[in-house]
Amino acid sequence: MEKRVRKTPLNPEIISLGKCIEAIIKAKGLKTREVAHDADLDVENLRKYIKGKQEMKVSTMLKIAKSLGVSVADLFLLNTKD
């Protein structure tokens, strides 16, 4: 089976947002599956968001932020750059 290749490059801001979410998860000592459960998301989708492989809706950002105990604005203020 051939590996699928992305038609469009990953958006750097989306990747950065995912890194921030991952950093908050680690800083709070949480597990990805716990955050996914609390946000009522499939764990695989959350992993795609964290890796920047899938864009998310604003409603999904709200759920993730709530499950992390931060605001959506905090996700962008805490956004890490490479």
Identify the residue ranges that each predicted region occupies.
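Short acidic DE-rich linear segments
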Residues: 3-4, 80-82
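Short alpha-helical DNA-recognition segment
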Residues: 29-48
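DNA major-groove recognition helix of helix-turn-helix
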Residues: 50, 68, 76-79
